[in-house]
Amino acid sequence: MIREGDKVVLVDPRGKRYLITVSKRDFHTDLGILKLEEIIGRNFGEAIKSHKGHEFKILRPRIVDYLDKMKRGPQIVHPKDAALIVAYAGISPGDFIVEAGVGSGALTLFLANIVGPEGRVVSYEIREDFAKLAWENIKWAGFDDRVTIKLKDIYEGIEEENVDHVILDLPQPERVVEHAAKALKPGGFFVAYTPCSNQVMRLHEKLREFKDYFMKPRTINVLVFDQEVKKECMRPRTTALVHTGYITFARRI
């Protein structure tokens, strides 16, 4: 049963989504005004109508909704890349993650959702404005119970020990390799997201210096092509989300 203060997703007849907090107020859309207090006491999957008679379905928010509707600042790590990081590093509930380059907090939200309330994410960020924006998004999504943001430079060292994963979105991830080697548990993953190939080459060169600490690194990227499906034809859409960044994985031994 939905209560006042809960977050819900409202979906209009066109498929447009609204992520709102349930309260005793009116919510204005181009399809009419919704009285949000009518949601209180209902269940997910039910619907309410606007004053113009349009029906809005009530859904439980998922992480994709928070990522779509969060406040944006610097460029985010896209869900396609975040999902790859989670899959290839084997990130699981209860894991302890050190992250750096928090930006708007998109990857932080994704990781916090995966590790769950028993896990922990510590995020290093050197810019106070980015840290403030990310923390607003983290609190809004309800993950402030498992995330800590440090206004510190990870290039100077990692304070945490026995870490499951070190995940970076930084210009010079090679500067963190030595720190990560000390902080990671055996079997943990060092992961770096980098937009440019020269960054990857510098990182691989540094990892070769630490071959006694890390398994042979692997670098991949992923391209996403949405398909346009019609009655008589299916073809890729004319726009596609192609290169966003390279992701390098190196496992601690």
From Swiss-Prot:
GO terms for biological process: tRNA methylation. InterPro entries: SAM-dependent_MTases_sf (IPR029063), TRM61_C (IPR049470), tRNA_MeTrfase_Gcd14 (IPR014816). Its EC number is 2.1.1.219. GO terms for cellular component: tRNA (m1A) methyltransferase complex. The keyword Electron transport does not apply. CDD domains: AdoMet_MTases. It comes from the Archaea. Pfam families: GCD14, TrmI-like_N. It catalyses: adenosine(57)/adenosine(58) in tRNA + 2 S-adenosyl-L-methionine = N(1)-methyladenosine(57)/N(1)-methyladenosine(58) in tRNA + 2 S-adenosyl-L-homocysteine + 2 H(+). One of its GO terms (molecular function) is tRNA (adenine(58)-N1)-methyltransferase activity. The keyword Iron does not apply. S-adenosyl-L-methionine binds at S104, G105, A106, L107, E125, D153, D169. Changing C196S: Decreases stability of TrmI at extreme temperatures. It is an enzyme of class 2 (transferase). Keywords: Disulfide bond, Methyltransferase, S-adenosyl-L-methionine, Transferase, tRNA processing. Changing C233S: Decreases stability of TrmI at extreme temperatures. Catalyzes the S-adenosyl-L-methionine-dependent formation of N(1)-methyladenosine at position(s) 57 (m1A57) and 58 (m1A58) in the T-loop of some tRNAs. Methylates the first adenine of an AA sequence. Homotetramer composed of a dimer of dimers; disulfide-linked. Disulfide bonds are important for the stability of TrmI at extreme temperatures. Contains a large catalytic C-terminal domain that binds S-adenosyl-L-methionine and a smaller N-terminal domain that may play a role in tRNA recognition. Domains are connected by a linker region. Belongs to the class I-like SAM-binding methyltransferase superfamily. TRM61 family. This is tRNA (adenine(57)-N(1)/adenine(58)-N(1))-methyltransferase TrmI. The gene is trmI.
